[in-house]
């Protein structure tokens, strides 16, 4: 089949494991002809969003990538919100896809995709949505955009969509409330991940723990991300420091924003059990998660939580509605420093409970998060 992924309302970043990357990678691996059409938005330094040059090249996920500039007679700050791009209709007509996957519900080119679907009724059009009340329509200008620009575009395009794929329960609520999308048009389609087989998992776990100097008596916690105050890394370190077990270790993977860097250094300077491993590629992070015993994410949401379930980690994560499907007997939902300390104390008292939680995390990942299964879903 011929599949086009339109990443014009979101970023597409080479060498990452975001949902867009994983679905493209799975479609390529399955032998389909895949094209990615993306904006120029990307990460410039693995920390800050920026913009690259338009062009055409072979992407890291195995598909050809066409990057299009923003268009329109507007200042750049507005163009990147309106999300108009030149030549999208011509690309669709030339490539002649069987399936269109439009990533990100909010953008002008959704109309272009819907027009193509209308004139080619055999084509499937799936639109994914990451929007929710925490990240969209939160400020005055953003509310205006969503109400008077994005919503009319979405409403005009709805008759030609096959499904709106929502990454969370909060996203489903948001799409119903703000855009007026009927419940039967919405489908739960969470951020997923790669699930290693037993042999590969044990290999990663054994090799990485040996490399890091851990034996099976150690309980290894891991928190990762682009750390700002919302990630609550400082809360994690404070909670961890209250547990004195010498068999506990805390790994920090990623980059710390300068706004919290001094506090993080102060909190961890006298804590030898805390290690900074720096920035890691997606594959390296997955292997580290296989080596870890518990994934920690008490702050803002990240796709690494789903990756950690695929790596069989029990979790300590923020108590928010979007985590409800993913924390079912395999970890703790926390809303405060005290909650996090309590979770760590329970693990200290009975580390054996992590074994059953690990099995449960694998079960949840297999049921909900396997990108191989999710990629196949987009073909029907």
Where are these regions (language model features)?
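A charged, aromatic-enriched C-terminal amphipathic alpha-helix characteristic of glycosyltransferases
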Residues: 351-380
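Nucleotide-activated donor-binding/catalytic signature segment of Leloir-type glycosyltransferases, i.e.
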Residues: 262-284
């Amino acid at each position: 089949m011929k599949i086009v992924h339109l990443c014009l309302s979101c970023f597409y970043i080479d060498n990452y494991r975001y949902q867009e990357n994983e679905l493209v990678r799975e479609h390529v691996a399955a032998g389909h002809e895949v094209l990615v059409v993306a904006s120029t938005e990307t990460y410039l330094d693995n920390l800050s969003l920026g913009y690259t040059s338009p062009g055409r090249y072979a992407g890291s996920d195995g598909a050809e990538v066409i990057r299009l500039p923003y268009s329109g007679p507007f200042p750049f700050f507005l163009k990147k919100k309106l999300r108009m791009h030149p030549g999208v209709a011509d690309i669709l007509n030339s490539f002649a896809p069987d399936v269109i996957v439009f990533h990100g519900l909010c953008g002008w080119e959704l109309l272009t995709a819907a027009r193509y679907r209308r004139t080619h009724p055999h084509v499937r059009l799936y639109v994914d949505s990451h929007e929710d009340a925490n990240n969209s329509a939160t400020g005055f200008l953003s509310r205006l955009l969503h109400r008077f620009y994005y919503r009319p575009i979405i409403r005009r395009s709805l008759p030609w969509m096959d499904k709106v794929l929502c990454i969370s329960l909060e996203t489903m609520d948001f799409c119903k409330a703000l855009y007026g999308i009927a419940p039967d048009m919405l489908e739960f389609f969470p951020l997923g991940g790669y699930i290693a087989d037993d042999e590969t998992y044990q290999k990663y776990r054994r090799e990485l723990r040996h490399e890091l100097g851990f034996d099976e008596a150690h309980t290894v916690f891991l928190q990762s991300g682009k750390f700002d105050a919302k990630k609550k890394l400082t809360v994690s370190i404070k909670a961890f420091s209250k547990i004195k077990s010498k068999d506990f270790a805390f790994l920090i993977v990623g980059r710390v924003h300068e706004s919290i860097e001094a506090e993080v250094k102060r909190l961890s300077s006298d804590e030898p059990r805390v290690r900074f491993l720096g920035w890691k590629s997606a594959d390296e992070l997955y292997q580290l998660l296989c080596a870890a015993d518990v994934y920690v994410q008490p702050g803002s949401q990240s796709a690494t939580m789903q990756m950690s379930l695929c790596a069989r980690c029990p979790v300590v994560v923020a108590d928010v509605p979007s985590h409800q499907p993913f924390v079912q007997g395999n970890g703790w939902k926390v809303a405060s420093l005290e909650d996090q300390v309590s979770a760590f104390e329970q693990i200290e008292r009975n580390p054996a409970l992590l074994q059953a939680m690990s099995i449960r995390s694998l079960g949840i990942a297999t049921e909900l998060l396997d990108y191989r299964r999710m990629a196949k879903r987009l073909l029907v």
